[in-house]
């Protein structure tokens, strides 16, 4: 089972395409949608929804996959549920870069402060990151340096921020899920 968490643009047609591509790894791909506008509510909703979905699966190694803001959540929700995560062009600092886009971006800072201290150290090797060299939204070199001590980092020379095509990375994602 793969949980797919969309980015800030929840209605992008690319989400369906990414889910379809992930079905080459596992036919059971589930969209876990969230509002993107209310971080504290989103966290509660995602925790409940993932726990509920896991009760209805016999997959011994479910995987979280998130793009952009979805990767922010995939890392945290995956950690709190003991799941591996794939973070694609993760938005690591929505409290800074979501100003003016959502109602309460400061809630992300509050969530970070209330999260398990040093959770990345406790989550080492439980996530893999895929970064676009040509990401038009974030400085992925800087973000990769924040995560490289904890997670493996892969680079893509073609895809933009929304990462329309996962095909080149599906074998690595599958190997990571099954390892």
Curated annotation (Swiss-Prot):
Specify the domain of life of the species encoding this protein: Bacteria
Q: Which Pfam families match?
A: UPF0227 (PF05728)
Secretion signal, residue range per the UniProt entry: none
Give the UniProt family note: Belongs to the UPF0227 family.
Q: What is this protein called?
A: UPF0227 protein Shew185_2404
Instruction: Please name the source species.
Output: Shewanella baltica (strain OS185)
């Amino acid at each position: 089972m793969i949980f797919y968490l969309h980015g800030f643009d929840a209605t992008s047609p690319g989400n369906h395409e990414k889910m379809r591509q992930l079905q080459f790894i596992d036919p059971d791909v589930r969209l876990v949608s969230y509002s993107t506008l209310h971080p504290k509510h989103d966290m509660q909703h995602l925790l409940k929804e993932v726990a509920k979905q896991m009760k209805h699966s016999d997959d011994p190694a479910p995987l979280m996959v998130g793009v952009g803001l979805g990767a922010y959540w995939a890392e945290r929700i995956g950690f709190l549920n003991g799941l591996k995560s794939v973070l694609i062009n993760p938005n690591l600092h929505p409290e800074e870069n979501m100003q003016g886009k959502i109602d309460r971006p400061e809630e992300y800072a509050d969530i970070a402060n209330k999260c398990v201290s040093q959770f990345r150290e406790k989550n080492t090797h439980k996530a893999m990151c895929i970064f676009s060299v040509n990401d038009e939204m974030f400085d992925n070199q800087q973000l990769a340096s924040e995560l490289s001590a904890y997670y493996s980092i892969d680079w893509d020379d073609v895809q933009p921020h929304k990462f329309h095509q996962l095909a080149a990375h599906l074998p690595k994602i599958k190997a990571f899920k099954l390892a």
